[in-house]
Amino acid sequence: MNLNMLHDNVLIEALEESLNNSPIQLPESAKKKPTKGKVVAVGPGSYNNNGNLIPMTLKVGDVVFYRQWAGNEVEFSDKKYIVMKESDIIAKEV
């Protein structure tokens, strides 16, 4: 992937939850957004008030959980991703 994230931004590929096996079809606006994803790219981090870099704690390949309405959806190379701040991520699988 040729996409460099800036600052403390994280590019996430949403992992679909298997709750859509129901015969009842819901409109897109009523469906629950995924809250689990795989980290595809990370920025270098953010700077504190002294100008020191605070490095990211996440790395490419990490599986994370994030707030349901966090980030912005983007499309790159015909694939949909979510861009969010590292602080919007609430947990990482270990």
Swiss-Prot record:
Family annotation (SUPFAM superfamilies): GroES-like
Disulfide bonds: none
Protein name: Co-chaperonin GroES
Role this protein plays: Together with the chaperonin GroEL, plays an essential role in assisting protein folding. The GroEL-GroES system forms a nano-cage that allows encapsulation of the non-native substrate proteins and provides a physical environment optimized to promote and accelerate protein folding. GroES binds to the apical surface of the GroEL ring, thereby capping the opening of the GroEL channel.
GO MF entries: ATP binding; metal ion binding; protein folding chaperone; protein-folding chaperone binding; unfolded protein binding
Keyword check for Cytoplasm: yes
Subcellular location: Cytoplasm
Main location: cytoplasm
One GO CC annotation: cytoplasm
Keywords recorded for this protein, A-Z: Chaperone, Cytoplasm
Superkingdom: Bacteria
SUBUNIT field: Heptamer of 7 subunits arranged in a ring. Interacts with the chaperonin GroEL.
SMART domains in the cross-refs: Cpn10
InterPro entries the UniProt entry points to: Chaperonin_GroES, Chaperonin_GroES_sf, GroES-like_sf
Coiled-coil residues: none
Pfam families assigned: Cpn10 (PF00166)
Family recorded in the similarity comment: Belongs to the GroES chaperonin family.
